[in-house]
A protein has these predicted regions:
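Charge-dense, helix-prone N-terminal extensions
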Residues: 1-163
Length: 163
């Protein structure tokens, strides 16, 4: 075999290996593609304003409607809780999931169990959330169902996050 052919074969093998083990799952790659689409849509919409809040609301409700149960019911309920607890937050999608932002920066988000094939949904908070408690505090919570107890805790967390 000539050195040129050997090099080409090696390059092809490396490419195949990189495609198989690039470190991201199919679900993660899909989420990144959704995030890129969200950024393009935001750029087309122009500067932030009331119109964008309405657009964000529509985007979030569409994502929630596309979810399967029980994630859809939890996401709908969380959407209502967050809107009532922190009306200053603007709904938007973030990596294809419902999120809520203050001054354009995500404060909290919902991640459906089906999105990443996990056994629970997640309510997460970003670094802009005011949840600090000493040197250690939780920033994500697993959700299997929403009862009155969980809802009360979420209300308190969201209010604290935006305080």
């Amino acid at each position: 075999m000539s050195p040129k052919k050997d090099t080409q074969k090696s390059a092809k093998s490396t490419t195949a290996i990189n495609k198989e083990s690039n470190g991201f799952t199919d679900e993660e790659r899909a989420a990144m593609k959704e995030r890129a689409q969200e950024l393009k849509a935001d750029a087309r919409r122009g500067p932030r304003g009331k119109k964008d809040k309405a657009d964000g609301e529509g985007d979030v409700l569409a994502k929630i409607a596309a979810m399967q149960e029980p994630d859809r019911a939890m996401a709908k309920r969380l959407h209502a809780i967050i809107k009532a607890s922190a009306p200053a937050l603007s709904p938007k999608t973030w990596y294809g999931m419902p999120a809520y932002a203050k001054d354009g920066k995500v404060v909290c988000f919902f991640q459906s169990a089906q999105k990443f094939n996990t056994r629970y949904a997640t309510l997460g908070f970003s670094e802009t959330a005011n949840l600090d408690e000493g040197a250690l505090w939780p920033v994500a919570f697993a959700l299997k169902e929403l009862t009155a107890t969980e809802e009360a805790r979420i209300v308190a967390l969201v209010k604290k996050a935006v305080s």
